[in-house]
Each structure stands twice: as C-alpha cells, then as structure tokens.
Design a protein with these regions (language model features):
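Alpha-helical scaffolding within the catalytic cores
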Residues: 104-110
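Conserved alpha-helical substructure of the radical SAM core
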Residues: 1-95, 100, 104
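Radical SAM enzyme [4Fe-4S]-AdoMet core and its adjacent flexible, acidic
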Residues: 111-137
Length: 137
C-alpha cells in the first residue's frame, strides 16, 4: 500500500507547530529547531486550514509547539483566536521559557493570552534545554 492510499479516519490528538525558530538548539530536538531558522511564524490562514482539518477528523483539542511559540506572543494570540473560531481547544502550549525575563512581564504576556484560550503551559526542562536556557527561567 502506497502513501497515496493512506487515509486518516479519525484523529484523537494532535499538535500545531507555529514556528521552527527557537532560542535553543537542543541536541534531541525532533524538528531540528534552533536559531538557524528564519523567524517566520505560521500564518493565520495556515493555522485555520490546520484547525479546519483537525476538526473535520473529529479532534476537538490540540497542543501548540515549535520552535518557541512564545517568542511571538502576538502571533500566538492570533493562532489561539483561530483555534477558537473552529471550536478547537488548546490542551497546552509547549515552551522552553526563554522569553521569561521577570514575573511581571510574564504575567503581562500570559494574561493577554489567557482569554484567547491559553490555560496551560508545558515547560520543557531537561539537560538539553539547560545547555542553552538557565534552569531558573
């Protein structure tokens, strides 16, 4: 059976990659994300296509990852808005916390995204991440 005949009948979970640019270059990164990528971000149109497809396959929630989605909080907000328009909830946004500078600025970023559907962060912490990002972040 060739790949052209492969059909996904139902999707039970999934993820949307917003970007490949990342402040780290973790040796274990499946997608080879890092600072060598352009700082491009998924367009709202592409996000909408993905959410439409996810919903059509019976999936009502996904996670968001990258790269580092929170390097561009305004664009992340637009993606969260698109998910809401298609009735797709966000399980979590994965982050390496490199964007974190202090509690006050983090609260400002996160409080702006919460009404858009960001309720949970999955913070990546490992020896690979700690090579590039201080554990304290």
């Amino acid at each position: 059976m060739g790949l052209s005949r492969l059909k996904i009948g139902r999707l039970s979970s999934g993820g949307i990659i917003t970007n490949y640019f990342c402040t780290s270059a973790c040796r274990h990164c499946l997608y080879n994300c890092g600072p060598h990528w352009e700082k491009r971000y998924i367009s709202v149109e592409d996000a909408e296509k993905n959410f439409r497809a996810v919903k059509a396959l019976g999936c009502s929630a996904v996670h968001i990852g990258g790269g580092e989605p929170l390097q561009r909080p305004e664009e992340l907000g637009a993606v969260l808005d698109a998910a809401r328009r298609f009735g797709v909830s966000i399980d979590y946004v994965e982050t390496n916390s490199s964007w974190f500078k202090d509690p006050e600025s983090a609260e400002a970023v996160l409080s702006g995204l919460r009404p858009k559907g960001l309720h949970t962060l999955l913070v990546s912490i490992s020896p690979f991440h700690n090579e590039h990002i201080p554990f304290a972040r």
